[in-house]
Amino acid sequence: PVLIVYLLSITAWQNIWMSISILVLIFLPLISFFLIKKLDFDTREQVDPTDSEIKEIKQWKRIEVIKDYRFYIVCLNMLAMPWIATGVFVYQSFITEAKEWGSFVIAQSFMVYSILSVLTLLGSGFLIDKFTSRKLLIFMNIPLLISTLVLFYFNSPITSFIFLGLIGISNGLANVLGSSSWAEIYGVKFIGSIKALTTALMVFSTAFGTALFGLLIDKGFSIEQIAMVSFVYILISLILLFFVRNKLNPQYI
């Protein structure tokens, strides 16, 4: 973001997009070719095919998942990050003007968002291996919840870094838990169709977030009021998840 803001000060935005397109066309195929050239698909795990526990784990089909109430509670939490973060990104100029942060502050804050997202991604893998995704789910949106309070109560430019940093932490957790949680709860045999469903819901939620933010802004809502709407949604989804947190274990046949 900081680089783009700097480039906008010295050249037209059309030139920036054209340069990005050329770089992607040239370097992405080359990088992809060299990275997958010696890709090994063999697993390092030693699995005993006669292990009774592995054979007894229920592998849920998508039609069964749709009928499971736990799916919708987990989805409420999984979809919080996409619709709220997309709303923030699309309407960042509205937030900047409302908080009087200045155009460069929000761009600099995205660096904090990116750094914390990457660090959380790296750390969350270790935590999942140690504690499982099911136990970490309840913590995923807590940083996002706090970020809405930061946006509601504070106006100082420094809070922009805290606000987007907290969103970055939730984003890092959501990116990893969004795949591993479904596999832990519903098994891996039909994970493709389950992930297709959840990905479709995620895409819908990003469009929903953009539309909802725009509608609320048109209705005269302040950014603080929008933050409180987001806070209430996250809080309700967390409370529901809290009550089913001990029922997310895989089922055995």
Where are these regions (language model features)?
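Helix-loop-helix hairpin linking two adjacent transmembrane segments in secondary transporters
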Residues: P1-D40
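A membrane-interface helix-boundary motif in multi-pass transporters
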Residues: Y6-I22, L215-Y233
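Flexible cytoplasmic inter-helical loops of multi-pass small-molecule transporters
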Residues: I36-W60, Y252-I253
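Extracytoplasmic gate region of multi-pass secondary transporters
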Residues: I63-S124
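Helix-to-loop junctions at the C-terminal end of transmembrane segments
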Residues: T120-T132, I217-D218
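Structural signature of the two symmetry-related core transmembrane helices
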Residues: K135-L149
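Intracellular juxtamembrane helix-capping segments at the cytosolic ends
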Residues: L173-Y186
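A late C-terminal transmembrane helix in Major Facilitator Superfamily
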Residues: I185-G220
